[in-house]
Amino acid sequence: MTTSATAPALLALQQACATVGLDPSTAVPVRIAENQIWRLPGGVIVRIARPGQAAAARREVRVAQWLAASGVRAVRPIDVQQPVEADGRPVTFWGELPAHEHGTETDVALLLRQLHALPKPDFDLGYLDPFVRVGERLQAATTLNEDDRRWLHELHQGLAVAWEKRPAGLPECVIHGDGWPGNLVRTATGRVMMDLERMSVGPPEWDLVSTAVRMTTTGAVPREQYATFCDAYGIDVTTWPGYRTLAGARELRMVTYAAQHAASNPEWAAQAQHRVDCLRGRRGPRPWNWKGIM
């Protein structure tokens, strides 16, 4: 099925599948966002990344292979030479997971604890950039007025300074980078890690902040569930002196992600503006009710 949203990646899908000997004629779109995800018959998932992301795609495949060798359950690349460059975009091929659902807070905590305990691999993962693509997203956020965009730019600059001066925390390690229940899922046979593109070396608090923000900022996680997360991991990151800096970076990313996509998806404009209004103190104190953006 081809729509106006899926059409830009269709040529890449066809070219990449031809390169590795797969048939894309009955491919079905699974998720159309910054990266496009397609399903092929036979349990193959095709991931079409943005142009210019070939190095990241190669690293993601290598990370998956390293996790498999380390005993961590995660998505697995299929046995073809990849990534494939097609129509200027890197394309990777993965084994489809069995039926699964979002992980619980305990699932997330236990997978993160297992990951954080691993020794660093013998290849370069790169160091965490907590503000990756924030500037690009702000530039694309055309539904916001100039005053709001200027304020967000200033917030970005202030948080970048605070990040460099953040207090010491836990020892740095391999981190997932986007550790929320949609990426750390549960199948009938156990917990599985997905979406490996943001894995890097950095402070483990960055992974823990994702769940904490869902309690303190968006209100998606009740305090009782957050307490189970802390018990399972062994630490409450909200008590760390650097929490507000990392939480602020997470909030900024969530706002700019929504604002960027509102420019091409008008139905998200109200939510993007709502998030900006919350940060600017126009919607009362945290937690706020932020709806998901796909």
Predicted regions and their residues:
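Active-site activation/catalytic loop segments of kinase-like enzymes and analogous catalytic loops
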Residues: E205-T238, A249-P266
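Active-site acidic catalytic loop and adjacent metal/ATP-binding pocket
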Residues: R31-V46, P77, A160-L208
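ATP/Mg2+ or Mg2+-diphosphate-binding catalytic cores
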Residues: R133, L138-L144, E224, T256-M294
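Conserved Hanks-type protein kinase catalytic core
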Residues: G95
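Regulatory N- and C-terminal appendages and interdomain linkers associated
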Residues: M1-P24, R150, H274-M294
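A short, glycine/Asx- and small/polar-enriched loop/turn
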Residues: E34, L40-G43, A86-P90, A249
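An alpha-helical support segment within catalytic cores of ATP-dependent transferases
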Residues: T6-L13, K120-G177, G234, R286, ...
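A conserved alpha-helical element in kinase catalytic cores
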Residues: L10, R47-D87, P98-A117
